[in-house]
Amino acid sequence: MRIAVFCSSSPTIDPKYVDLAYQLGEGIGSASWELVTGGGHISMMGAVSRGARAANGRTVGVIPQALVDIEFADHDNDELHVVETMGERKAMITDISDAFITLPGGAGTLEEFFEIWVGRYLKFHNKPVVILDPFGIYKPLHELVLHLESENFIKPGMRDLISWTTTIEDALAACGQ
């Protein structure tokens, strides 16, 4: 099974988030699953890959050439796919992955999460969509989703397509659904 992880590449975040990513990577590797990321070597993105490799897991990165050019690529990946655009990156990650876990992150992470969630709702795929949030950073997002549903902006059942988890074990279990 291939698990895509969306997460921050910011070098200025609290180290607890980087540790979380590393531990998730270890969990994926220990399960003998493959990790798919955006192909970068910094911050949480790099940590999740290092964790997977430390547990003898296989890692796959998908990165646009522009990011390779500024030395963000993780060349230790077992596979590193270099594409031209961010759109191609997301499409390839979606195509080659069997489930998606979103960790804390910024605008890019949220954009990836929303595309996967909406894609599941529209039946472009039927793959698990998981949020791993042990620190409560996505609590306001969860509340917003509930509010949007109560105001009929989100159809009933759409929120149920997201598995909201707080432990690595629960996140990995949700991927196996």
Task: Give the role of each language-model region.
Residues 127-135:
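Short loop-to-beta-strand entry elements in the cores of soluble alpha/beta enzymes
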